[in-house]
Amino acid sequence: MTARPGRRGYLDWMRGLAVVVMVFWHTLDAWTTPVDKASGAFWYCQLIGGFGAPIFLFLAGVSVALAAGSRLRRAGASPGGVPADAGPPPGLAPASSQPAPDLLPASSRPQPGLSPASAGPAPGLSPASAGLQPGQGPAWAAAWPMVKRGGWIWVLAILFRIQSDVLGGRTSIGQLFMLDVVRGNTQKVDILNVMGPAIAGAAVVWGLARTAGWRIAGSIAVASAFAFATPGIRAWTALDPLPDAIEGYLRPFAGRTTFSFFPWAGFVFAGAAIGVLIDRTRDVVAERRLITWFGAGGVALWILSALSAYGPSLFGPSDFWRTAPSFFFVRVGIMVAGIAACYLWEARPRLLGADPFSPMRQFGVTSLFIYWVHVEMVYGGLSRPIRGQLPLPISLLAFLLFLTAMLGLSLLKSTIAERVRARRSR
C-alpha cells in the first residue's frame, strides 16, 4: 500500500505564490506615481495583485479541513464519518499546517492574513482535552481548536491596527484612545478581520457535519450563499442605520472597509470543501488522481462562470469586478486549477529524486511573518521618500529588490526558530 501523503509542499508553494502576489501589489500600490496608476499596464498589475487575498483566504479554509481531519484521525475516528452521537460545536486546529492564511488588500493600507497549508501531524484530541463536555463527539473536539484559532486571528487584526498607529507616530495614550476608540480605527475591517470569523465558521460547519459528504456540501452551500447574497447586501438600504462598525463587516464603504464578509468569507468555505477532499485521500496515488480532477474541474468552473457573466443577473444589479457571483466563482475555479498547477510544478524535481530549495515554499511557511514585517516597510515611514514617486518600470524593479530582501528575512526567521527549537529540545 502506498504511504499516506505527508506535508503537502504544493500547498506551501501556492501560499508562497500568494505572498509574492501580495508583496507585488503592495509595493506597486504604495510607490507608483499617480500618473502611472492611470495607465493600462497598472490595471493589469492590479488584476494580478487582486488574487493575493482570495488565495490566502482559500488556503485558510483548506487548512481548516486538513487540521481538523488530522486531529480526528489521531483521536481514532475516521474523517469520512462520525459516530451517530457526535454532537455539534466547532473547532479548529492547525493540523497540517501552521498559522492561518494571508490576504491582499487593494489599495489603502492592507492587512494580510496568512496561513500555512498542508499537512503536519497534530496531536490527538479528545472532547475533554479540547475543553468540551463529554458526549459532544470527536468531530466537535477536532474542530474546536480551529474555532479558537479563528478568534485569535480576529484579535490579531485589532492588534495589527494598533501597531500601525503606534509606528505611524501616534504614540501617546491620548492619541491612541482618540484614534482607535473614539474614532473607531480598530474597528476598520481588513483581511484578518474577515479571515478570523470565517475560519471559525468553516470549523463549525466541519464539526457539525457527520460525514465528509455533508462537510463538503455544507461548505459549498455557505460559500455560494456569500457569493449570491453580495449584490443584494451591497444595495440593501435596511442596513444603513447599522453602526459603522457592524455595517463595515457586511459591505465596504469608504474610509473603514477594505474587505467585508460578502463575498470574501466565501473563499474560506470554498477552500474548506477542497480541504475535505484532499484530506480523504489515503495515499499519494489517490491524491494524484484527485489533483487531476482539480485541474479539469477548476478550468471547467472558470470557463462556465465567465460565460455566465454574459447572461442576465438573477440576483440584482452587480458589478462584475466587485459584486458579481460569476467573478467569485471564476476566482474559485482559477484557484482550484491552481492547486493542480502547483502540484505539477512541485513534482518536477522529485521525479528526478531531488528536493531543491524552493523560495516559494519558504515564503509559504513564513507567510504571516512576511505580511507582518512588510506592510509597515512598504506603507510606513521607512519608504516615505519614494511613496507615490516611482514610474511603473522602476516600481517593478524596486519590487524585485524588496522581495529578495524579504526572502533573506524569511530565511533568517526560520534559522532562528530552528535554533530556538533545538535548544528547547535539549
Regions found by a protein language model. Name each.
Residues G87, Q98, D102, R109, ...:
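Intrinsically disordered, low-complexity repeat regions of secreted/extracellular protein precursors
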Residues M1-G81, P88, S97, L132-R426:
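Alpha-helical transmembrane segments and their immediate juxtamembrane cytosolic regions
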